[in-house]
């Protein structure tokens, strides 16, 4: 049985709740001592993990829609991507304001250079910013064929974000490894497309070098 347009609307409502409820829990935890001994780190890790969850969920939609034969499921992909960007922005903001502090924001550039895992994180965020800004149908029409080329960069985020997470933790625990494994699995489901993209980029690079 295929999803109807009305069911997709209700599914989107549920996804909005899934994006909002963690924020409400975080606010409650901050105000009621629900965080650990290092609340700043807990906030950073919580916001980062939530962003990663929405990224993986967005990547899951296409293969799920294909294998389950639910084409309307694709309509939820943009929403998941926007929630991923929202939580990634909270993650970046929590680092800038809580870790560095308002008076030390000038140090952010130095931090990005001296801590490579932060570089991976900011690259991922900039890509997500571009994808969020161009996610509307009007931008899709305006960019034409370049729209898909731009949004293929989500696969780069799917590589960089788990590495950023793994690199940022001092002690490797099962959790970041699970996220990394899920990202690898979701990318593996697209190996034909990724191989095609790689070959196209290699051909373009070869042509430019030959000029």
UniProtKB/Swiss-Prot annotation:
Coiled coil feature spans: none
Record-annotated membrane-spanning stretches: 8-28, 54-74, 82-102, 116-136, 153-173, 178-198
Pfam families in the cross-refs: Ferric_reduct
Main location: membrane
GO MF terms held by the record: electron transfer activity; FMN binding; heme binding; metal ion binding; oxidoreductase activity, acting on diphenols and related substances as donors
Gene Ontology biological process terms from the UniProt entry: protein repair
GO cellular component: plasma membrane
Manner of cofactor binding, per the entry note: Binds 1 FMN per subunit. Binds 1 heme b (iron(II)-protoporphyrin IX) group per subunit.
Keyword Transmembrane set for record: yes
Topology relative to the membrane: Multi-pass membrane protein
Superkingdom of origin organism: Bacteria
Cofactor entry: FMN; heme b
Keyword entries, A-Z: Cell inner membrane, Cell membrane, Electron transport, Flavoprotein, FMN, Heme, Iron, Membrane, Metal-binding, Transmembrane, Transmembrane helix, Transport
Compartments reported by the entry: Cell inner membrane
Complex and partners: Heterodimer of a catalytic subunit (MsrP) and a heme-binding subunit (MsrQ).
Function description: Part of the MsrPQ system that repairs oxidized periplasmic proteins containing methionine sulfoxide residues (Met-O), using respiratory chain electrons. Thus protects these proteins from oxidative-stress damage caused by reactive species of oxygen and chlorine generated by the host defense mechanisms. MsrPQ is essential for the maintenance of envelope integrity under bleach stress, rescuing a wide series of structurally unrelated periplasmic proteins from methionine oxidation, including the primary periplasmic chaperone SurA and the lipoprotein Pal.
Family per record: Belongs to the MsrQ family.
NCBIfam families xrefs: PRK05419.1-1 (NF003830), PRK05419.1-2 (NF003831), PRK05419.1-4 (NF003832)
Annotated protein name in UniProt: Protein-methionine-sulfoxide reductase heme-binding subunit MsrQ
């Amino acid at each position: 049985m295929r999803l109807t347009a009305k069911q997709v609307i209700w599914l989107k409502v549920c996804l909005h709740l899934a994006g909002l409820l963690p924020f409400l829990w975080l606010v409650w935890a901050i105000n009621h001592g629900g965080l650990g001994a290092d609340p700043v780190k807990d906030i950073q890790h919580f916001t980062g993990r939530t962003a990663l969850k929405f990224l993986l969920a967005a990547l899951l939609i296409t293969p799920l829609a294909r294998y389950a034969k639910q084409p309307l499921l694709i309509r939820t992909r943009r929403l998941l991507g926007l929630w991923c960007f929202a939580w990634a922005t909270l993650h970046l903001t929590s680092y800038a304001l809580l870790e560095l502090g308002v008076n030390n924001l000038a140090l952010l550039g130095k931090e990005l250079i001296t801590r490579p895992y932060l570089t991976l994180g900011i690259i991922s965020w900039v890509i997500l910013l571009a994808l969020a800004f161009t996610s509307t149908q009007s931008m899709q029409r305006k960019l034409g064929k370049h729209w898909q080329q731009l949004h293929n960069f989500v696969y780069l985020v799917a590589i960089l974000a788990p590495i950023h997470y793994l690199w940022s933790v001092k002690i490797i625990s099962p959790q970041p490894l699970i996220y990394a494994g899920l990202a690898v699995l979701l990318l593996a489901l697209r190996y034909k497309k990724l191989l095609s993209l790689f070959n196209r980029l290699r051909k373009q690079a070869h042509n430019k070098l030959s000029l």
